[in-house]
A protein has these predicted regions:
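Short aromatic-glycine-(Arg/Gly/Cys) micro-motifs in beta-strand/loop hairpins
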Residues: 1-14
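Active-site lining segments that contact anionic ligands and/or coordinate catalytic metals
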Residues: 2, 147-149
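Ribosome large-subunit tunnel/peptidyl-transferase-proximal elements
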Residues: 19-21, 25-28, 33-35, 43-123, ...
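Short, charged/polar surface micro-motifs in flexible loops or helix N-caps
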Residues: 124-128
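Short, low-complexity, polybasic intrinsically disordered segments
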Residues: 129-140
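C-terminal structural segments of small proteins and small subunits
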Residues: 142-144
Length: 165
């Protein structure tokens, strides 16, 4: 299982991932990473479901606005957002969200997309395919065909208290 931990180091909050069989083992790994004398304070630990699409033939720059729009939404709502988007990134993000839902159901026994939230949806730059375009007088200009990685992290939705003020 994958667990997400939040930690505070020198006044800034950051996140990291740890692989473990259960929450106690994950907590032990996090405690080993940050010993008691360090200035880092672990804020929380929760189980997440991760899916990654690697080396997608698209520029990460063009798909990042759509990825940001999906963050914080329920998985079913995020699928609706990307389904009606005309961008090329929509197909890649949709497949990755569906893969993360399938990972949650098949590998970890989650109940489905109804109670999962998109915690993180990022498009990161990958390698570039180098090509050359022939130009005048026998010279050539380099062309970089960009690729990207899409990573989606789903977490269990927090149950909100109805009627709370």
């Amino acid at each position: 299982m994958t667990f997400l931990y939040k930690f505070n180091k020198n006044g800034t909050t950051a996140e990291g991932y740890v692989q473990a069989s259960d929450e106690a083992a994950a907590q032990a790994k996090v405690d080993a990473k940050f010993p008691a004398g360090s200035k880092t304070k672990v804020l929380g630990l929760e189980q997440v479901y991760v899916a990654t699409t690697r080396n997608a033939r698209m520029s990460a720059f063009k798909g990042r606005p759509l990825a940001r729009a999906c963050q914080g939404l329920k998985a079913s709502e995020a699928l609706k957002v990307v389904e009606f988007s005309p961008k090329k990134a929509a197909d890649i993000i949709k497949k990755t969200i569906l893969s993360a839902i399938a990972n949650a159901e098949n590998n970890h026994g989650a109940k489905g997309a109804a109670d999962l939230t998109v915690k993180l949806c990022v498009l990161e730059e990958s390698v570039r395919m180098r090509r050359y375009w022939p130009t005048a007088r026998g010279s050539a200009h380099p062309i970089a065909r960009r690729l990207c990685h899409c990573r989606v992290v789903l977490a269990e939705s927090k149950k909100s208290k109805k009627g709370a003020k």
